[in-house]
C-alpha cells in the first residue's frame, strides 16, 4: 500500500516534531533522542544549508523512522527532497506550482493553509490533509472549530504556536490529526546536546496526549 499523508499524520499523532538542524553532526543523536521518547515521524525543515544532508543521514541510519522534508517553498525542492530520501513533504502554503511539483515528485504532501479560501484551493488540488499555519493558540482553535462544518472530512496539523499548555485543546478537536511542534527539540537543547531532556519532552507530550484516551 502506498504511503499517504493521512497515514503519515496518523502515525505522527500526537506530535510531529519540526526540526531545524544547524549542525549536521548532531542530526542522528537528535533523531535517536526523539525516537527514544516515542516519536516515529520527523519533519526536517529545509531552512539550513545542510538540511537535506541531515535528512539523508537519518534515512540511512534510522530506517525505523518516517522522515519528511518541511518548509518547501520552491518547486524544485520537492525532487531534491525525494532524492535525499524524504518520505513526505510539507510546505507553509500552497500554490499551483508547488502542488504540481508535489504530484510530479510522488511524495505525500501536506500543504499549508490559513484561510477558508486557501483550504478550498488545496481541496481543488485534491488535498484533504492540511497544515494550519501559523496556528496561534486560542484563535486557531476557534478557527478549526468553525472549519469543521463546511470542511467535512478535512484533517489538519496545526503548526506554529502549539505548546504543551494548549496541546490538548488542539488534539481534542475531531478535525485535528496531530500537531506540529518545535518545542520538543528547541535549538538551545540541541546545541547543548541535552538528549535526555529532549527525550523527556517527547515522552511528556505523548503521555499528555495519552490522557485523552483514558476513560473518564
Each language-model region and where it sits:
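Catalytic cores of alpha/beta
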Residues: 30, 74-84, 117-125, 162-178
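Distinct, well-ordered alpha-helical segments
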Residues: 27, 55-59, 123, 144, ...
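Glycine-rich phosphate-binding active-site loops on the catalytic face of alpha/beta enzymes
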Residues: 88, 92-98, 131-141, 175-197
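Anionic-ligand binding region
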Residues: 116-130, 140-150
Amino acid at each position: 500500500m502506498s504511503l499517504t499523508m493521512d497515514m503519515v499524520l496518523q502515525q505522527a499523532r500526537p506530535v510531529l516534531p519540526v526540526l531545524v538542524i544547524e549542525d549536521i553532526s548532531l542530526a542522528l543523536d537528535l533523531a535517536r533522542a526523539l525516537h527514544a521518547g516515542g516519536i516515529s515521524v520527523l519533519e526536517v525543515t529545509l531552512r539550513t544549508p545542510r538540511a537535506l544532508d541531515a535528512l539523508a543521514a537519518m534515512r540511512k541510519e534510522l530506517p525505523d523512522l518516517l522522515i519528511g522534508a518541511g518548509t518547501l517553498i520552491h518547486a524544485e525542492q520537492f525532487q531534491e527532497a525525494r532524492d535525499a530520501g524524504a518520505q513526505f513533504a510539507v510546505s507553509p502554503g500552497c500554490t499551483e506550482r508547488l502542488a504540481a511539483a508535489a504530484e510530479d515528485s510522488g511524495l505525500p504532501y501536506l500543504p499549508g493553509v490559513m484561510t477558508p479560501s486557501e483550504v478550498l484551493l488545496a481541496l481543488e488540488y485534491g488535498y484533504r490533509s492540511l497544515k494550519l499555519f501559523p496556528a496561534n493558540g486560542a484563535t486557531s482553535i476557534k478557527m478549526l472549530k468553525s472549519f469543521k462544518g463546511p470542511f467535512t472530512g478535512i484533517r489538519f496539523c496545526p503548526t506554529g504556536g502549539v505548546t504543551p499548555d494548549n496541546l490538548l485543546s488542539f488534539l481534542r478537536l475531531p478535525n485535528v490529526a496531530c500537531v506540529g511542534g518545535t518545542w520538543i527539540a528547541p535549538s538551545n537543547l540541541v546545541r547543548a546536546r541535552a538528549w535526555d531532556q529532549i527525550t523527556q519532552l517527547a515522552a511528556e507530550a505523548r503521555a499528555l496526549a495519552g490522557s485523552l484516551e483514558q476513560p473518564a
